[in-house]
A protein has these predicted regions:
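Residues within helix-turn-helix
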Residues: 17, 28, 57
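Short basic helix-loop element that most often maps to the first helix and adjoining turn
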Residues: 3-22
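Short, charged recognition helix plus adjacent turn
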Residues: 61-65
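DNA major-groove recognition helix of helix-turn-helix/homeodomain DNA-binding modules
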Residues: 43-58
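Recognition helix of helix-turn-helix/homeodomain-like DNA-binding domains
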Residues: 25-38
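Short, Lys/Arg-enriched C-terminal cap helix and immediately downstream tail that follows
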Residues: 8, 42-43
Length: 65
């Protein structure tokens, strides 16, 4: 899964640590999300999108199947 979390996070000058605190996860989770190594739950994806003032569809893209 490809993500645009880092792009949106940088728009708000937000660190990985700050985003993790706001979402309620560890910084490592944000790192794995940004690297595409972790597929989030719907709840986590929704919370990240809400904090970054965007939609889940704008943040996450499925890899070709």
């Amino acid at each position: 899964m490809k993500t645009r979390i880092k792009e949106f996070r940088n728009r708000y000058n937000m660190t990985q640590e700050k985003l993790a605190d706001l979402v309620g996860v560890r910084r490592e989770t944000i790192i794995y999300l940004e690297q595409g190594k972790y597929n989030p739950s719907l709840k986590l994806a929704y919370n990240v999108a809400k904090i970054l003032n965007t939609t889940i569809e704008d943040l996450f893209q499925l890899d070709d199947i």
